[in-house]
Regions:
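Low-complexity acidic/polar repeat-biased segments
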Residues: 47-90
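Acidic, glycine-rich calcium-binding repeat modules characteristic of RTX/beta-roll
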Residues: 1-48
Length: 90
């Protein structure tokens, strides 16, 4: 996976395919701020709801088709919020 820095201000991390940050090669977002930043997977989900979880404090996972398997995940380095506080554009 890639290491991403958004810098100061609001950032949107856009993904168009699940393999771009799948559990085998997930990206690390090194400065994710839940009050400003968001993850956009609308090209994958087309508005459908997703299931989310946060494990080990910083590993954020999404089930993009609600089949019980997490297809995408990110390491949100230094993240201190909850899974529900991560803004995901679907």
């Amino acid at each position: 996976g890639d290491e991403l820095w958004g810098g100061a201000g609001a950032d949107t991390y856009i993904y168009k395919q699940t393999y771009q940050s799948d559990p085998g090669s997930n990206d690390a977002i090194l400065d994710f701020n839940y009050s400003e930043d968001r993850i956009d997977i609308s090209a994958i989900t087309s508005g459908a709801s997703v299931s989310r979880t946060l494990t080990n404090g910083t590993l954020f996972k999404l089930d993009t088709d609600n089949n019980g398997t997490y297809e995408m995940q990110w390491d949100l380095e230094g993240y201190t919020g909850t899974a529900d506080q991560v803004t995901v554009v679907t």
